[in-house]
Design a protein with these regions (language model features):
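Generic non-transmembrane alpha-helical segments
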Residues: 2, 6, 10, 209, ...
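Predominantly flavin-linked oxidoreductase catalytic cores and closely associated redox partners
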Residues: 5-152
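FAD/FMN-dependent oxidoreductases across multiple families
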Residues: 126-213
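Generic structural signal for well-ordered, non-membrane alpha-helical segments
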Residues: 40, 68, 84, 101, ...
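Conserved N-terminal/central alpha/beta ligand/cofactor-binding core
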Residues: 1-19, 271-280, 285
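Short secondary-structure transition/capping segments
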Residues: 64-67, 118-127, 197-200, 262-280
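Active-site/binding-pocket entry motifs
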Residues: 81, 114, 166-169, 190-191, ...
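C-terminal helical "tail/cap" subdomain of flavin- and related membrane-associated enzymes
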Residues: 212-298
């Protein structure tokens, strides 16, 4: 809401409670606007599709990307906890399913006022990921946290409708990141980091880049070619994301994930440990390890 308010203050027209049903295509197949679920049609010189992981614009265009399939599953709940408010992210690496070390982690993220965000996430390169009941796994994780925190049970959280779960696309699931008339950003682009799942910063950065590239292209040539956006994204994140996709596949092997956990457990410095866990961030000095991960950051 803060970002929407800021955009509105700067002159953007904000349509609250409005959903896009799909794109408007011209006779040549170029995206020339959007159709709202209400049936209203809005024409546009260029569309920035930041319409989420299940992007109706991307689905309507039948986009095929060489990077499709990279994703994480995340589940979390906000709740009261009898623990001190601290300004740090607790990361728990021991996540197991039927004896296998999962390629993921759990987190406890303080919200202030005696409330916490507790959740977990794991990537879908693990061969049994579809067999995992994420709600049950979260319940087991909660049960393993200190009893003196007096946390609610998973059943109580479900009854209160406090549990949220989602599949997070990552590693650029729309590539190239544009088609004539449209540029993809955020989860519609699959902008989350393919190893850690950090998504908020990349959503904002890709949206900014898409806007700037759209303006530049419209000024210099028109909406049929946004190659400048491909170049911008590739220059900024291409090397990091290629490395991250390789890492995503690698940690899906339980023995490799377990070896990684043992290595991290041997690191006594919490700051270094966090940087090793969210290892992509060594190349991104603007990102704090405390803001990373599919839970608090996405």
């Amino acid at each position: 809401l803060m970002l929407l308010d800021r955009a509105e203050f700067c002159g953007a027209e904000v349509r609250r409670g409005t959903e896009v049903a799909g794109p408007i295509l011209d006779d040549g197949g170029r995206v020339a606007g959007v159709v709202l679920k209400s049936g209203e049609r809005i024409a546009a010189d260029a569309v920035i599709a930041a319409d989420g992981a299940h992007s109706p614009i991307k689905r309507a265009l039948n986009l095929v990307s060489q990077h499709n399939g990279y994703a994480a599953i995340a589940i979390r709940a906000e709740m009261s906890a009898n623990r001190p408010d601290v300004d740090s992210l607790d990361v728990h690496l021991q996540l197991r399913f039927r004896g296998d070390q999962l390629p993921g982690y759990g987190w406890v993220f303080p919200l202030g006022g005696g409330r916490v965000n507790i959740g977990l996430g794991y990537v879908n390169s693990y061969r049994k990921w579809q067999q995992i009941n994420a709600t049950q796994l979260l319940g087991e994780f909660l049960a393993g946290l200190p009893q003196e925190w007096q946390l609610p049970s998973i059943g109580e959280l479900m009854k209160a409708k406090a549990v949220r779960a989602w599949r997070l696309p990552m590693g650029f699931t729309a590539w190239p990141p544009w088609r004539p008339g449209v540029l993809f950003a955020g989860d519609a682009l699959g902008a989350a980091r393919p190893a850690s799942g950090a998504g908020i910063s990349k959503g904002l950065q890709s949206g900014l880049a898409a806007g700037e590239c759209a303006i530049a292209a419209l000024t210099n040539g028109g909406p049929d070619d946004f190659t400048n956006y491909t170049q911008r994204v590739e220059a900024a994140w291409g090397k990091e994301y290629r490395r991250g996709r390789w890492f995503h596949r690698l940690v899906g092997v339980p023995a490799i994930a377990a070896a990684g956990v043992r290595t991290l457990d041997a690191v006594s410095n919490p700051s270094v440990r966090a940087r090793l866990l969210f290892w992509e961030q060594w190349s991104d000095p603007e990102t704090s390890p405390h803001s990373a991960g599919p839970g608090p950051e996405s």
